Amino acid sequence: MKYYRNQDSYWWADADDPFLWRESLPFVRVGLAELIIMTLVSLVLAVIAGWFWWPLAVPFVLVAALVAWFFRNPRRKVPETIGTVVSPADGKLVEIVEVDDPIIGAAVRFGIFLSVFNVHANRIAMPGRVVRVRYRPGKFLNALRSESTKENENIDVELECPEIGGRIVRIRQITGQFARRIVCWARVGDVLQRGEMFGMIKLGSRTELVIPRDEALEIVAQVGEKVCAGSTVFARYQQG
């Protein structure tokens, strides 16, 4: 429990969090347990293997380095301009489509594919108040397949965003073929800022962002672009 901000029925505010200092580490906090255990095991095996013949230690050292790389949490420069929509995930932007959403209405959906080499922390696209967090059980299809959006296990986080008149923005965390663990600590009533971390998907997967479509919306991102959570600008709502 100590490795998590929220886990099971335990939760505390930042002011009461005895482990808040872990937010300053260069690694994602919710991955510290795996990071410590897997790195230590890999390094111990490297020492043992190296005792017999040093080249045998190389694969274990590489595994330790890969684990540390996977759970890294680089600092991001978050745009402050009102109306700016930033990427909720690192990876490759594989989809920009217009959709009719049952809650948002006329909308634009952005799909981001995360490989095992990307940072897997999820960040808020626009500041707002969380109005719904919904979990759906499902399959574990390859995240590159279009049907994974609806059929795979996922979590929706919906925010009411004052910068666009209180309309809803949705971020969906989707599991993949190998990524079968979603972490989300956003709670209904939380007020989250643009670029603020709210969760993580462990191993390769997919993240989607759905925003309202209107005449004031200018999309600046392009399909195929490599994006960074919290800093890459997807779109802007012109203020006027």
Curated annotation (Swiss-Prot):
GO biological process: phosphatidylethanolamine biosynthetic process
Source lineage: Bacteria, Pseudomonadati, Planctomycetota, Planctomycetia, Pirellulales
InterPro entries to which the protein is assigned, alphabetical: PS_Dcarbxylase (IPR003817), PSD-A (IPR033175)
Residues the record lists as Pyruvic acid (Ser) modifications: 205
Record EC number: 4.1.1.65
UniProt entry tagged with the keyword Chaperone: no
Site residues (Cleavage (non-hydrolytic)), renumbered to this chain: 204-205
Source domain of life: Bacteria
Localization per record: Cell membrane
Organism name: Rhodopirellula baltica (strain DSM 10527 / NCIMB 13988 / SH1)
Residues at the active site: 205
Full protein name: Phosphatidylserine decarboxylase proenzyme
Protein encoded by which gene: psd
Transmembrane segments: none
Self-association state and partner proteins as the record states: Heterodimer of a large membrane-associated beta subunit and a small pyruvoyl-containing alpha subunit.
